[in-house]
Amino acid sequence: MVRREHRSVMIQEVVDNLLTNTSGLYIDATYGTGGHSTALLGCLGPQGKVIALDCDQSIRFDHTSDPRAAAGHANFRELSGYLRCAEIYGADGIVADLGPSATQVHDAQRGLSYLHPGPIDMRVDPTLRVPLSGRLMRTGLGTLHSSLRCHGFSGRTKAAASRILHIVRKARYTTTLDVATAACGLHNQGKHMAADAFRALRSMANSEPQCLRSLVRHAPAVLKPGGRLLILTFDSFGERMVRASIEHASCLVLMRTVAPTQREVDTNPGARSSLLHVLRRTGNPRSAAPQHTRP
């Protein structure tokens, strides 16, 4: 397997759509390898600030010597509470990248890859108590079948779900390769089917729909009026999650969606299916915190 260094996606598009005030406060809710934070700091003035967060405890933050940067480990579903505890209010923008990094995928012990063996874990946030194997032990056939179907699984979803549950529950030792084989069965499009299945399983392991709904629901309380929330998705399920979350959110409107340039797709394979959703806060949410001037 060729190891590919992770490269943040649509960096310039994020800056162009997020940065409205060079002295503003911006939150990178999924720091990863720091591409978006680095670009934002490069465009901010001396009074600007970037708060970088990531739920992955193994992440090491750059820019620690930059007085305009602050960092911490937190899941973006906890964004509102994290900032409240830090007495930070009135952000000009938030960006969240919903895809896993290549660094995480290539770490076999995380179990995120269907190309080499690893434990059936898939937790991006290690503070989550239950790995995927534990979740599958108590997941019903109908639930897994529905998740596979929602993620565009191209095979017989119920049969694949049944094989996955059987091998996880009955085998004495099971790896991610066994799960990939169970998902694909005898189908000749195995690689694509395994990718779809692993997206569904990763979403389940990390409660991704619930995390996104929490982010969208609480973002208006964090943002200033007119502030932006940018969300990067990488498949049709992610796009549907964003749109469904917006329907139930107060004071957020979708301004536009932005696709990567062909040049970026050609040079950064991770951008191929990406889409940037640009949301703007309007009005005053009932749960909004009072605006504070940062010291």
Swiss-Prot record:
Per UniProt, the enzyme's principal EC class comes to: transferase
Q: Which cysteines are joined by disulfide bonds?
A: none
Enumerate the SUPFAM superfamilies for this protein: Putative methyltransferase TM0872, insert domain (SSF81799), S-adenosyl-L-methionine-dependent methyltransferases (SSF53335)
- Lineage: superkingdom: Bacteria
Enzyme Commission number(s) from the entry: 2.1.1.199
Pfam families given for it? Methyltransf_5
Keyword list (alphabetical) reads: Cytoplasm, Methyltransferase, rRNA processing, S-adenosyl-L-methionine, Transferase
Catalytic activity reads: cytidine(1402) in 16S rRNA + S-adenosyl-L-methionine = N(4)-methylcytidine(1402) in 16S rRNA + S-adenosyl-L-homocysteine + H(+)
Q: Which Gene3D superfamilies match?
A: Putative methyltransferase TM0872, insert domain (1.10.150.170), Vaccinia Virus protein VP39 (3.40.50.150)
The Gene Ontology biological process annotation of the record reads: rRNA base methylation
Q: Which GO terms describe its molecular function?
A: rRNA (cytosine-N4-)-methyltransferase activity
Quote the InterPro entries the UniProt record gives: RsmH, SAM-dep_MeTrfase_MraW_recog, SAM-dependent_MTases_sf
Record-listed S-adenosyl-L-methionine binding positions? G34, G35, H36, D54, F76, D97, Q104
- Which Gene Ontology cellular component annotation is one that this UniProt entry carries? cytoplasm
List localization entries: Cytoplasm
| The family this protein is said to belong to | Belongs to the methyltransferase superfamily. RsmH family.
Function, in words: Specifically methylates the N4 position of cytidine in position 1402 (C1402) of 16S rRNA.
List the PANTHER family hit by this protein, alphabetically: 12S RRNA N4-METHYLCYTIDINE METHYLTRANSFERASE, S-ADENOSYL-METHYLTRANSFERASE MRAW
Q: Tell me the protein's name.
A: Ribosomal RNA small subunit methyltransferase H
Q: Can you name the source organism?
A: Tremblaya princeps
The protein's gene is named: rsmH
